[in-house]
Amino acid sequence: MRILIITGLSGSGKSTAVRALEDEGFFCQDNLPVMLFPTFVELVDKAKERVRDVALVMDIRGRDFHAGYEKVFQEISEAGHFVEILFFDATDEVLIRRFSETRRRHPAMESGSVPEGIRYEREQLAGLRRLATMIIDTSELNVHQLRELVISHVKGNHGGREMTIHLQSFGYRYGIPLESDLVMDVRFLPNPYFVPELKEFSGLNPNVRDYVLKYEETRIFLNKFKEMLEFLLPGYRREGKSYLTVSIGCTGGRHRSVVITEEMRDFFRTKQLNLNVSHRDMKKGLEK
């Protein structure tokens, strides 16, 4: 069976992810003690109605959640099941705003404030975060975008047989995506922002694309970036990595990073990989 461990910060979107997984046919179980995970998986595996996909929610609400979970995951894997850990995260600012909007109490709050609860929860979940197969930063995602991302992941990655690539552009002005495995800074490339007739367009505009790609330094960079990935991808496959997030950033995330991300889209398409492409910050500036 395929076992997804759903974990992460309170308010980061785990409930949305679970609902999306249920719609995709996953058998989902919330608030189960960690030490019972192997027994639960064994019972489901022996059920008359064959279940292939299971999602188990694991978070700070389970007071024993940090008790021997590495051994538990290993036990499930050794029983022949494929285990993935999806860790949902968001910035403190976004989490605080979400709790304020919903008027929910943070589960880690005793007598302290929401920020203190978030800080405590981050400390408690740090070990799980390091083990995560995939870290999903939901700070800039709405419910529909998060749902789409989760569904795209589970449909594209069946039992780890193929690697899924998430290729995204971003703006350093808004922060590096937390879930990044590889980050490429393209702020050294010629900037269409300073060309009056191009400034208000995005990197999807043909004229902006032509401007960025006409420079020799851009072409040299693309060749070297592709050469590096040609070297890295087989190594990641040998390691058994099932999901790779490649983030490409420029200052505002609207021009250069979008152009380069679209160019790399064509490169990854030739590699017979599952590919998701997004432009996180492209719409945060003026666009035509």
UniProtKB/Swiss-Prot annotation:
- State the SUPFAM superfamilies in the record: P-loop containing nucleoside triphosphate hydrolases
| Keywords annotated in UniProt | ATP-binding, GTP-binding, Nucleotide-binding
Report the GO molecular function annotations.
Answer: ATP binding; GTP binding
Keyword Protein biosynthesis attached: no
Amino acids binding GTP: 59-62
A Pfam family matched in the record: RapZ-like_N
Q: What superkingdom heads the lineage?
A: Bacteria
InterPro entries reported in the protein's UniProt record: P-loop_NTPase, RapZ-like, RapZ-like_N, RapZ_C
Residues annotated as binding ATP: 8-15
Function comment: Displays ATPase and GTPase activities.
> HAMAP family, per this entry?
RapZ_like (MF_00636)
Q: Which family does the record assign?
A: Belongs to the RapZ-like family.
Name-wise, this protein is Nucleotide-binding protein Gura_2968
